[in-house]
Amino acid sequence: MRLISLLLFVLLLAIQYPLWLGKGGWLRVWDLNRQVNEQTVHNQALKLRNAKLEGEVKDLQDGTGAIEERARYELGMVKDGEVFVQFVAPAPKVSATPPLPPPPNSVAGRGGH
């Protein structure tokens, strides 16, 4: 009886091995699902980037507004008769006097008389 139980247990393990660890087992399916989810997120990011680039290409093909904007911001170009004005944030003030030295060590707790 003990031998039959052991044999059945070994057969059960032999049947379970492909289910969990085989080529189409649960662990492999779980890993593939994780990879599909990661790739889906990556593809969505690429779709957004492609849509942005497609819109930019259409702007460049259809009108001069996008070309003019790029020339202004990326190349620093101005039209004839325009004056370029740039506002710069003020730098923090630097004190002309050096910082005060630290106070000398005082004796604390002696009563001070």
UniProtKB/Swiss-Prot annotation:
GO terms of biological process kind: FtsZ-dependent cytokinesis
Membrane-related topology note: Single-pass type II membrane protein
Protein name (record): Cell division protein FtsB
Residue intervals on the Periplasmic side: 22-113
Keyword entries, A-Z: Cell cycle, Cell division, Cell inner membrane, Cell membrane, Coiled coil, Membrane, Transmembrane, Transmembrane helix
Segments in the Cytoplasmic topological domain: 1-3
Family: Belongs to the FtsB family.
Record's subunit section: Part of a complex composed of FtsB, FtsL and FtsQ.
Coiled-coil region: 34-64
InterPro entries: Cell_div_FtsB, FtsL/DivIC
Primary site of residence: membrane
Role: Essential cell division protein. May link together the upstream cell division proteins, which are predominantly cytoplasmic, with the downstream cell division proteins, which are predominantly periplasmic.
TM helices/strands, residue ranges: 4-21
GO cellular component: cell division site; cell septum; plasma membrane
Domain of life assignment: Bacteria
NCBIfam families assigned to the protein according to its UniProt record, in alphabetical order: PRK00888.1
Region Disordered, annotated ranges: 93-113
Pfam families linked to this entry: DivIC
